[in-house]
Amino acid sequence: MANSAQLRNEIAAGKWDDKLRALYGDAAQEICRQRARYCAALEQFELYFGPGRQVQVYSAPGRAELGGNHTDHQHGYGLAAAVTLDLVAVAAHNTDGYVRVKSRGFNKLDVIDLTVEGPQEGESTHSASLIRGIAEGFRAAGKAVGGFDAYTASDVLRGSGLSSSAAFEMGMAAIWNGEYGCGLAPAELAKICQYAENTYFGKPSGLLDQLTSAVGGIIFADFADPQQPFLEKIHADGLLPPGMSLCVTDTRGSHSELTGEFAAIRQEMELIAAFLGKKVLGQVTESAFWAALPALRKACGDRAVLRAIHYFEENARTLAQRDALQAGQFDAFAALVLESGRASFALCQNVYCSTDVRHQGLSVALALSQSILQGSTGAWRMQGGGFAGTIQAYVPQSLLERYHSEIERVFGKGSCYILRLREQGAVKVI
């Protein structure tokens, strides 16, 4: 383990380039950018926590949802891929029992006293609640947790649908796992992070985001037993055929004030399930749902009914997407992507917020994508929780320059990311 100044010099000299290539690819320009980014993070760590500390550097990726929009929390299927946009954390353990985290772009220094357990008043929806909840998750797993100081620099857009929260959570979990030798498996870390987000942060998320950031690659998950989900890793290299790029567009809206909208999707799906005597839609047969349709409309309302239909269709579609990827049939996969996008509009109804119809960035981005890509081998859909944030598009090389240019003309410079997928999950880099 090196001190921060030594490590900064080594990174700048290229000593750790092989580690960076494993995460970010071989492009020389990207490796130079990551060297500078890591060195800047080390400098900021020294600024806030002092020079000469023995440090380690961790990385946790964001994720692109490939299929299974709002199915995981109903014990259905999920399909997602880790991406090269990530959170980097420089960390050093301490002996005073406090966790201190400074995140780039945020003025506040989070300070958590680990002797104070349980959710704290006024802390929910703030990053401190996630840290406290993750600490509790480690304790519940029988692991002793100590203090650490960390500086984080995230390229995962906040409120963008690339799951910045999961990247932050997994970064914190990776630090504890690494600094204190806890030895927990990636899936166990993911469940701890989901617990923290649900119980301490107060957002009813599923598990797929955390699993993808923890494990890396393309993850197919069956959440029939959410405590022990069945996981299948599909290597990321098999997704895109030659000449096809995955673009993610930040429409410059934010998920940050939309927790109630997200929660309503889960609540309405579970309202349908409860009427049919079950807890979640994954426990309901589709035939029983259709048989009860008249009564469900009256008791639960049409939006809840439509969202339940979305669940059944999207769940079947996600399984078909997995099969298409495993068979190397990108055309079949792309057709299913388009179907998923249409379902978000018509059934799940999470492309825009019904109380703010003036702002429909996702709708505009999808319409623009259709105008450029229709008739090609590409595809487009909304991703993530919805209502604001990002869309994704699979863009053939012949249209990539035009697509990128048009998207950034409408949504601003730097809004369109051409992503690589990442095989590694949350890891200690150095």
Identify the residue ranges that each predicted region occupies:
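C-terminal nucleotide
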Residues: 1-63, 88, 92-124, 220-381, ...
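A short glycine/serine-rich beta->alpha loop
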Residues: 53-54, 70-77, 116-124, 154-162, ...
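Glycine/serine-rich anion-binding loops at beta->alpha junctions
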Residues: 59-75, 155-172, 376-394
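Structural signature of FAD isoalloxazine-binding scaffolds in flavoprotein oxidoreductases
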Residues: 76-96, 215
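Beta-strand segments within the central parallel beta-sheet cores of soluble alpha/beta enzyme folds
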Residues: 100-102, 147-154, 183-195, 334-339, ...
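Glycine- and acidic-rich phosphate- and metal-coordinating loops
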Residues: 135-157
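Phosphate-handling active-site elements
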Residues: 140-148, 175-192, 397-410
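Fold-level recognition of mixed alpha/beta catalytic cores in primary-metabolism enzymes, strongest
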Residues: 160-248, 430
